[in-house]
A protein has these predicted regions:
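Bacterial N-terminal signal peptides that target proteins for export
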Residues: 1-11
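C-terminal motif of bacterial Sec signal peptides marking the signal peptidase cleavage site
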Residues: 18-20
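Structural detector for internal amphipathic alpha-helices that build alpha-solenoid repeat scaffolds
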Residues: 23-35, 45, 53-67, 72-76, ...
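Acidic, Ser/Thr- and Gly/Pro-rich intrinsically disordered linkers and low-complexity segments
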Residues: 229-240
Length: 285
């Protein structure tokens, strides 16, 4: 009798799974046929299906369809117990750019494993600046080393898209106070960081910190600096040109020698002196 009950239970589970699979397949078919609203409603109804595989497909479908209903429906699934499904919920909240979920996603950063960290990074990258500003603020305001480290790891995982938001932290602080911020920029190891930070060389409040940040970026800052110096020949902002010249010297960038030499006969003595100093740093004589 006990064996019969067990078999019945298994049969019911299989039937439920089959029903769920059939429903999600129908929803996906409707979506392919262009019946987006009907497909969305069916997918939303399957977000709490008993099968994690069905829930996973439902989350992906809701994210693909998008629209006003998608964000709130996905946000409700932030309590998902299956790790893989939850990561997909996180990614798709970013995909549909549902802003009311940003703070909840930021909360998750402090208790994330490496897989969830990547999912959160994908989401914040999709959201863009409004969400990145939130994690930059959390990183900057935290007094607890563990929490601060968690947000630091998330910022690094997000990548060069953080450059604009994090550059604002450099203002009014010493090199020592900004050491963690410089470390974030260095660890991203992407030339785009340098390109995105270039406009801040014209900001007197933060320019010297940006010069230091470029030094920390190392070889990842060389090409962007050379390109910026080339453009400066037309704009003629002497202070920005001088800073770019200094950066090439600090980086000991041999690739920049030709560009520096093109500035060696500049009308400004200040520029000529900066070129001489940078060439000395690069060549050693």
């Amino acid at each position: 009798m006990r064996a019969i009950r067990k078999n019945i239970a298994w049969i019911m589970l299989i039937m439920l799974f089959a029903v769920g699979c059939s429903s999600i397949e129908k929803a996906e078919s409707l979506y392919r046929q262009g019946e987006k609203q009907e497909a969305l409603e069916m997918a939303i109804s399957l977000l709490d299906d008993d099968s994690p595989k069905v829930r996973l497909r439902a989350v992906k479908l809701v994210g693909s369809i998008g629209g006003p209903q998608a964000g709130p429906a996905l946000h409700e699934r932030i309590v998902e117990t299956d790790g893989r499904v939850l990561r997909e919920v996180v990614r798709n909240l970013g995909k549909v750019k549902y802003e009311p979920a940003i703070e909840d996603l930021a909360d998750m950063a402090t208790e994330s494993n490496s897989d969830m960290l990547r999912a959160l990074a994908d989401a914040f990258r999709e959201y863009g600046k409004p969400a990145i500003d939130v994690i930059v603020s959390r990183y900057d305001s935290s007094n607890q080393s563990g929490i601060r480290a968690a947000y630091k790891d998330l910022l690094i995982a997000v990548g060069p898209e953080i450059a604009d938001s994090i550059s604002k932290l450099l203002k009014g602080r010493s090199f020592f106070e900004n050491r963690d911020t410089f470390d974030i920029l260095r660890q991203i190891k992407n030339p785009r960081v340098a390109t995105l930070m270039m406009p801040y060389l014209a900001d007197e409040e933060v320019a010297e910190q940006v010069v230091e940040a470029m030094r920390n970026l190392g070889s990842n800052a060389i090409e962007a600096t050379i390109n910026a110096l080339q453009k400066q020949k037309k704009s003629g902002d002497l202070l920005v040109s001088e800073r770019l010249i200094r950066i090439l010297g600090l980086l000991k960038a041999k690739q920049g020698i030709e560009m520096l030499e093109s500035y060696s006969q500049h009308d400004s003595e200040r520029i000529r002196n900066a070129v001489e100093q940078s060439l000395f740093q690069i060549r050693g004589f």
